[in-house]
């Protein structure tokens, strides 16, 4: 929850001198009031209705930061044989945002170049959620022969395994499931093949069957009923910067930055929207999915998602949309002092929220997706094993 008021704190800074016998010579310690918690937000207003039962979203931003002054003790020897003991001193809290790459002094988020990829990914993926189902008849027709051949082998194996299990013949069950020793001649190829059949045969088929059933059995939507889709994509940005006006210290930032797209829309042309959701209006989508090795490209650069997003808004009208950035920022720094022994620890924390509105569907742009996720890696290993064993 975002605070609604600032908080100041009274800090005591130690500066004590001792002679060579350890006797107190002077105490120049002082106290100073500094801001600990700073918050800022945009002014709000009550939005009006742009259509019956739908209230217009508004632009809004809000943010705060908590700045903990340095904690640590420093010592140094004096020319007369004495010594001094001191704290680091007061650091201007505004240096936290001055060194930050994503947060301004007024607590407004500046996404920066780091955010371009996650922004474009979120906009494409929210457009792909506009379809009422994942059913793609166009591709299914083109793949009918391959799918039938792929599933025939699995169907026979599973039916035989099921029949053997009912009769208590567990050796036959293991044999049909490729677990018995005499059927395990090429485990890498067999396991890879079964894994690929699961990923590209069974799972898409079951998804299409469920989507077809849902589409055919769902009740008809009322005319101009507001619908909504949402998608959030985030990333972590870690970096170090040399402190401005510093004596050589380095500040380490850890930012968690995310963007959320939310779109309210209605179906203006049911026939066009229906055809679009079935994948019948975009021949590029079918052509790409049938291109050899296109799935390898999609691991790094999801061209298929981009092509699909281009036609998904067909037959739909947007009512309104919002793009919301959220930022969580943490700072850690170790502060030295020239001529002194010792270090001080500096920590700070900030959180910010920034929502903007739009009234047209976002334009899909290419983005890069990490190929090192667990599912992508498993698919890659299975495909490599398949190719090597041929």
From Swiss-Prot:
The keyword ATP-binding does not apply. During internalization, MP is proteolytically cleaved into two fragments allowing translation and replication to start. Transmembrane segments: none annotated. GO terms for biological process: viral genome circularization; virion attachment to host cell pilus. It is found in: Virion. The maturation protein is required for the typical attachment of the phage to the side of the bacterial F-pili. Binds to sequences located toward each end of the genome, hence circularizing it. The RNA genome-maturation protein A complex is released from the capsid upon host receptor binding. Maturation protein A enters the cell along with the viral RNA. Belongs to the Leviviricetes maturation protein family. This is Maturation protein A. The gene is A.
